[in-house]
From Swiss-Prot:
This is Protein Vpu. The N-terminus and transmembrane domains are required for self-oligomerization and proper virion budding, whereas the cytoplasmic domain is required for CD4 degradation. The cytoplasmic domain is composed of 2 amphipathic alpha helix that form a U-shape. One of its GO terms (cellular component) is host cell membrane. Its main location: host cell. The chain crosses the membrane at residues 13-33. The modification Phosphoserine is found at residues 58, 62. Ion channel activity is inhibited by hexamethylene amiloride in vitro. Belongs to the HIV-1 VPU protein family. HIV-1 lineages are divided in three main groups, M (for Major), O (for Outlier), and N (for New, or Non-M, Non-O). The vast majority of strains found worldwide belong to the group M. Group O seems to be endemic to and largely confined to Cameroon and neighboring countries in West Central Africa, where these viruses represent a small minority of HIV-1 strains. The group N is represented by a limited number of isolates from Cameroonian persons. The group M is further subdivided in 9 clades or subtypes (A to D, F to H, J and K). Phosphorylated by host CK2. This phosphorylation is necessary for interaction with human BTRC and degradation of CD4. It holds the Pfam family Vpu. The gene is vpu.
């Protein structure tokens, strides 16, 4: 057992640490990207819900919220409220 440990070079340990560090960076980057997508989707869902509530209350939709939602989803004209259920 001691012979095996003696034959292992320190470069192997350093290489393993570097590979582990790279894997950790990749995994945390992917997790952060997915987290940002989730937060953005929640914000979009909240805005859609708010626009629908205002449309039901006042009979028309809120222009400010629609503009904010358009900028978030990078679209020109949203037709989220043009449904038969409203």
């Amino acid at each position: 057992m001691l012979e095996l440990i003696g034959r292992i070079d320190y470069r192997l340990g350093v290489g393993a640490l570097i590979v582990a560090l790279i894997i950790v960076i990749i995994v945390w980057t992917i997790a952060y990207i997915e987290y940002r997508k989730l937060v953005r989707q929640r914000r979009i869902d909240w805005l859609v819900k708010r626009i629908k509530e205002r449309a039901e209350d006042s009979g028309n939709e809120s222009g400010g919220d629609t503009e904010e939602l358009e900028t978030m989803v990078d679209m020109g004209h949203l037709r989220l409220l043009d449904g038969n259920d409203l």
